[in-house]
Structures are given as structure tokens and as C-alpha cells.
Design a protein with these regions (language model features):
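Amphipathic alpha-helical segments that line or abut small-molecule/effector binding pockets
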Residues: 16-19, 133, 137
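Glycine-rich portal/gate segments that line the openings of hydrophobic small-molecule binding cavities
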Residues: 39-86, 134-152
Length: 152
């Protein structure tokens, strides 16, 4: 059972600022509130073949994901795989400059569910999509708030 999801958001900041904030793992809990820990395991952090462990608290249940960076073209593209016992997810993030100085963040996710999650995913599609949209909106708010607090 697979699911594809594309989310797009316009951020009122230049691409370099968006990338800087997105690329800093210390910022992740600020826009992914269920993230409990991020631990680098191997490779050069943030670069292709780097492996990290992310631990989330999903309604009292610990979900451990292994992130592997698959591609990076700073400041416009970051791709990775995220594996857990419930799913394998490929996420590709594009950051595009607009003519107005904003940044369009386009995220494409391709999920392959495992075990009983193959069945559960049928009922959870809306909540999974909502969660992605909410995380991206929190990131937008983080960037725009930081920019307003620390103008160049």
C-alpha cells in the first residue's frame, strides 16, 4: 500500500534564509513538535549518505525513524529516505525563489506502508496529509518570525 502526497507553501523570506533554518537540526523540534530527539549516526551531517535517528512521540507511542540523506543541492533541493517499522518514505524537498523575493517550498512524499499500517493508511490519509501541512505551516511561521525578530 502506497501513498503519495505533495505539499506546497509560500514563505515570506529569501531562499538562503529558508535553507539556513531548514538545514539546522536544532530547529527541527520548533516546527516538528512531536520530535523528541535527533541523533546523527554516520556520514557527514546533512550530506548524501548521512544517516540519523529521529525519535517521535506519537500520542504516547515512540516512533523511531532512520533518515538517510540521498541528495543535496544547496540551497534548492534535499532528498531523503525515512524508514521505520511501519513505513518507508521518500521525501524530496524543493526550494524555489520567486520574483517577489519569497521562497516556494514544495515537498513530495512517497510512502510505502508495512504490516498492519497498510490497512490503517486507508483510514489515516487525511490525518497524514494534515500533519504534513501543519508541520510546513509551523516551519513557515518559524522562518517569518525569526526574520521579523532579526532583520538583516
Amino acid at each position: 500500500m502506497g501513498m503519495k502526497h505533495k505539499t506546497e507553501i509560500l514563505i515570506d523570506a529569501d531562499r538562503a534564509t529558508v535553507w539556513r533554518i531548514f538545514d539546522d537540526p536544532d530547529n527541527m523540534p520548533k516546527w516538528q513538535p512531536t520530535l523528541r530527539s535527533f541523533k546523527h549516526k554516520s556520514g557527514t551531517p546533512g550530506q548524501p549518505d548521512a544517516v540519523s535517528e529521529l525519535v517521535y512521540d506519537e500520542n504516547g507511542r515512540e516512533v523511531v525513524m532512520t533518515e538517510t540523506i540521498t541528495a543535496r543541492r544547496e540551497p534548492s533541493f534535499l532528498g531523503g529516505t525515512y524508514d521505520s517499522k511501519w513505513a518507508s518514505i521518500v521525501i524530496v524537498n524543493h526550494f524555489e525563489e520567486t520574483d517577489t523575493g519569497q521562497t516556494r517550498w514544495v515537498s513530495n512524499a512517497n510512502c510505502r506502508f508495512k504490516g498492519f499500517m497498510k490497512i490503517m493508511a486507508l483510514f489515516m490519509r487525511k490525518s497524514i496529509c494534515y500533519r504534513t501541512d501543519a508541520d510546513m505551516n509551523r516551519f513557515k511561521l518559524l522562518v517569518e518570525t525569526e526574520l521579523a525578530s532579526n532583520p538583516s
